[in-house]
């Protein structure tokens, strides 16, 4: 299993070519050679194919909110959606510094995107209602959640607060 811990993202950002080597026993076999890394190598499953044109028709020109925008899943959503020409991105996260990093990435790669960075906790109903009223998102991608199950089994009340009650507030 490939453990990336952000390493792959850093290599890609530096425009470094990433290769994979087949298992030692397979070296030299027909079709087994050093090759460019594929998404399947990282996911260890077959990728899901999506109709990007269909998705783009829902995103282009729309106000899109992404909660958990500075997390690993949310940040990838930001990247994917930024390329689909939304009217406005409303990016919500409780982590100020990582959200600032998302802002810098947007400025580097999608300078023309109108993006609003909002530091907010999805469990704060008053704040979230204010954000919905002020920005009127047409679509919401809710990625604000705790995802490390074994750790959250020892922190059940926090997991329920964010993953369940936070989702109810967003809904």
Regions found by a protein language model. Name each.
Residues 102-112:
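Short, conserved SAM-binding/catalytic segment
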Residues 143-147:
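Conserved NAD(P)H cofactor-binding loop of Rossmann-fold oxidoreductase domains
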Residues 93-98, 122:
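Helix N-cap at the beta1-alpha1 junction of Rossmann-like dinucleotide-binding domains, i.e.
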Residues 116-139:
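Conserved Rossmann-fold cofactor-binding substructure of NAD(P)-dependent oxidoreductases
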Residues 64-84:
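N-terminal Rossmann NAD(P)H-binding glycine-rich loop of SDR-like oxidoreductase domains
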Residues 14-16, 110-115:
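A short helix-to-beta-strand connector/capping loop
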Residues 2-19, 88-95, 134-135, 139, ...:
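NAD(P)-cofactor binding segment of oxidoreductase domains
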Residues 4-63, 70:
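Flexible, Lys/Arg-rich cytosolic regulatory linkers and terminal tails that connect or flank
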